[in-house]
A protein has these predicted regions:
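A short alpha-helical cap/connector motif
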Residues: 1-195
Length: 195
């Protein structure tokens, strides 16, 4: 398919090979009715991968929350265009807004999987983590992206401003909820399962 992306933070071309974790840890959901949530969808690269590779059962759906801020340029237009090209747009629910507010609309234990890759500010990450955990089903999985942002690639654009803020926030969340979760992967991304 001829999708349009200006950045590649997800595919095999990405130095962290994050798509490999998605393939490994989400395979249990393939061909099953699932509800997924993505916080921070940008142009839809990870959304499309999940639609085409995991959310293959007819009733599976994904909710995509993003502010699509002005600094992202035409990212929202590209997101909608890319999703339309999949032929699976009926499975995608677009929620344009701040995740800390939008997470409140979902009932407890609603999602099987939640991908957190939104605002990387420490306070925002903590809000996303706690809000996501509330709406995650028991046995469900959360993946936090950019855990080592500003640490493993200190010279990459924007990472100095982050100064490890995502790591601090995720570590705080993991400590507070340690009895209610299992860490299944911890590297550039952190993957947890709710007990």
């Amino acid at each position: 398919m001829d999708y349009e992306f200006t950045e590649d933070w997800f595919s095999e071309n990405n130095p962290e090979k994050v798509v490999r974790q998605f393939d490994e840890f989400l395979s249990e959901f393939k061909d099953k009715p699932c509800m997924f949530l993505e916080i921070g969808s940008f142009e839809g690269m990870s959304t499309i991968w999940m639609l085409e590779n995991i959310l293959t059962e007819e009733s599976s759906q994904i909710f995509c929350i993003d502010v699509w801020a002005e600094w992202t340029g035409d990212a929202f237009v590209r997101f909608v265009s890319n999703i339309n090209k999949t032929g699976l747009k009926d499975k995608v629910h677009i929620v344009k807004g701040d995740s800390s507010e939008e997470l409140r609309i979902f009932p407890k234990e609603y999602f099987d999987f939640i991908y957190v890759d939104g605002n990387h500010d420490e306070k925002a990450v903590i809000k996303d983590a706690i809000g996501s955990f509330r709406i995650l089903k028991k046995g469900g999985i959360i993946a936090f992206d950019d855990y080592l942002l500003g640490i493993s690639y200190p010279n990459s654009p924007g990472s100095k401003a982050m100064n490890g803020s995502t790591k601090k926030a995720i570590d705080y969340f993991l400590d507070v909820f340690q009895d209610e979760l299992e860490i299944i992967h911890k590297d550039y991304q952190v993957w947890i399962r709710k007990k």
